[in-house]
Design a protein with these regions (language model features):
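Long beta-strand-rich cores associated with HINT superfamily self-processing modules
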Residues: 222-250
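Structural transition elements
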Residues: 38-79, 99-102, 190
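Alpha-helical secondary-structure segments
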Residues: 1-41, 88-100, 189-208
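Extracytoplasmic/peripheral linker and loop segments enriched in polar/acidic and small residues
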Residues: 13-16, 28-29, 65-66, 120-131, ...
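Extracytoplasmic/secreted envelope proteins and their assembly/folding machinery
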Residues: 11, 15, 19, 24, ...
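Ligand/substrate-recognition segments at binding pockets and active sites
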Residues: 78-149, 220
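Pocket-flanking alpha-helical
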Residues: 8, 26-31, 129-163, 206-207
Length: 250
């Protein structure tokens, strides 16, 4: 929440420290025994393509550096706390009470974030509907949320954080970011190379400002009988479509 309700979260160095103090590998291990992907950006791997057919996530990873580095996190946190005029800070992180993954995720976040001197982390769990309402109303300090792609393009995720997006629950504002997304969705929309460059720039701005903290990319394992044919799998929307599915006699 960057509305100013939480003193400290409007400081970029403090947010950067929280990102660096997030052990995504341990979170993936606790949530799915390592099945879920370790994010290198906001846009998950396998969703969108570059102009040359490569994975957009790999292109974006060259502009970001999401990594667990507690030593650097402590340094930035100390600098940020001094700039904010704080000696101690307590953060409440909200998750969904009817989700086992929320508990595992918040436990790991609490464990690593509290390595930052002067920081106390409290966990708060509410029902799913309440969590959605709290996010929409800005009634949170830090909140664990998720998103499923509506279409196979990076802007389905990156568009969440423009200043006028109804899904920008943290109320982070960046004119530079808005310009990058606006360019990707308007003047560069039909120019793949230019559009991808805009989207990579947006990923870089998100990372540099620590406007969001991606903790894991969800991977969904599926066990399919080899006799079942014709199932269509997509990286966006409903994911799997069975309209053409059939059982082979072979």
């Amino acid at each position: 929440n960057q509305t100013g309700k939480v003193k400290g979260l409007t400081n970029t160095k403090i947010r950067q420290a929280l990102n660096l103090a997030t052990d995504r590998k341990s979170i993936s291990q606790s949530v799915s025994e390592g099945l879920d992907g370790i994010p290198t950006g906001m846009t998950p791997a396998g969703l969108a393509k570059t102009a040359t057919g490569g994975d957009f996530a790999k292109a974006a990873a060259k502009a970001t550096a999401y990594a667990y580095n507690i030593k650097k996190a402590k340094k930035l946190f100390a600098e940020g706390m001094k700039e904010a005029g704080l000696k101690k800070m307590t953060l409440t992180v909200e998750g969904t009470s009817d989700s086992t993954t929320s508990k595992s995720t918040l436990d790991t976040i609490q464990q690593t974030w509290e390595q930052l001197p002067g920081l106390t982390v409290k966990e708060k769990f509410v029902p799913f509907k309440q969590r959605l309402q709290d996010a929409a109303n800005g009634n949170f300090q830090v909140i664990l949320t998720d998103w499923i792609a509506d279409y196979a393009e990076a802007t389905t995720f990156l568009g969440l954080f423009t200043s006028d997006s109804p899904n920008n629950d943290g109320k982070w504002v960046s004119k530079e970011y808005d310009q990058a997304i606006n360019a990707a969705e308007s003047k560069d929309a039909l120019n793949s190379k230019a559009r991808i460059a805009d989207e990579v720039r947006a990923e870089k701005i998100l990372y540099q400002n620590s406007a969001v903290n991606p903790v894991y990319w969800v991977n969904s394992p599926v066990l399919t009988n080899p006799k079942v044919k014709g199932i269509l799998n997509f990286s966006s929307g409903a994911g799997s479509y069975y309209m053409h599915a059939y059982i082979s006699k072979k």
